[in-house]
């Protein structure tokens, strides 16, 4: 079993093109959709309208996976956050003291979902699957920073090809594909300031929804006698932290493109599983 963990953004789509061109030896790509109500709508549109047709035209399997509950129903990150009576905070919210919270979203909705798929298709400790992750050369410090499960062997083919993130637009354009948006949940607390500013300016309805989610989380926290949490690093409600007309000062590299999200918090979380 040999699969590429596809995240929907720059590196993943560059890898898809390289595979179609015979430069990357992967013919099965797995996209973990963490929820139609959770993924950025622009990412879902790109995957369905561009990536999947391109993959099919070049004999590549691009499977869309979702997390299922024991009763067979689909579970989403947004659904877990907003479920009646839920105390779960699977996303890395900022605590009231500024510290990042722990999270389980990547492990539960991506790593375990891909793990289940490869095991269903024959992966085991005796015959582990090769799972490729789209980390580019400029992100080499992110490679090998999570525990490898017995049923898998992690691979970083973009490193072998010495592909940098800045190379991805040219690779994608060479296939006649438009540039994909940066991939992440629309409410992800790892968004940098620029992403929130762009959302408020370009997609105000989505920004308002993020503010509403923050309100819901804090209403529940208040009922439980707990401190507030925030979706940004500014220690105040999103609608106050991001003002209308605010300028983007620095390039925003916030994304969840490698198919998995990797941060120090995730490394610690993985070793607690």
Q: Where are the regions that the model predicts?
A:
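Nucleotide-activated chemistry modules centered on ATP-dependent adenylation/adenylyltransferase
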Residues: 1-273
């Amino acid at each position: 079993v040999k699969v590429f963990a596809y995240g929907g953004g720059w590196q993943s789509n560059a890898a898809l093109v390289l595979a179609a061109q015979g430069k990357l030896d992967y013919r099965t790509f797995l996209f973990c959709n963490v929820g139609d109500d959770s993924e950025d709508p622009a990412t879902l549109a790109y995957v369905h309208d561009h990536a999947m047709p391109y993959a099919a035209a070049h004999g590549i399997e691009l499977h869309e996976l979702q997390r299922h509950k024991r009763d067979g129903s689909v579970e989403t990150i947004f659904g877990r956050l907003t479920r009646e009576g839920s105390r779960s905070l699977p996303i890395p919210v900022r605590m009231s003291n500024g510290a990042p919270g722990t999270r389980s979203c990547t492990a539960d909705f991506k790593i375990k979902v891909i793990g289940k798929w490869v095991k269903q298709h024959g992966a085991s400790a005796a015959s582990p699957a090769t799972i490729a992750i789209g980390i580019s050369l400029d992100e080499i410090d992110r490679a090998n920073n999570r525990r490898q499960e017995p049923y898998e062997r992690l691979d970083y083919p973009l490193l072998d090809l010495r592909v940098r993130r800045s190379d991805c637009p040219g690779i994608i354009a060479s296939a006649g594909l438009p540039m994909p948006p940066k991939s992440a949940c629309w409410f992800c607390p790892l968004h940098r300031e620029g992403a929130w500013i762009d959302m408020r300016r370009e997609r105000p309805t989505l920004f308002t929804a993020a503010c509403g989610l923050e309100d819901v989380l804090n209403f529940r926290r208040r009922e439980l006698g707990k401190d507030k949490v925030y979706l940004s690093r500014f220690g105040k409600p999103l609608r106050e932290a991001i003002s209308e007309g605010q300028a983007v000062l620095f390039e925003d590299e916030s994304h969840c493109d490698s198919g998995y999200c990797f941060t120090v918090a995730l490394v610690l979380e993985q070793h607690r599983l």
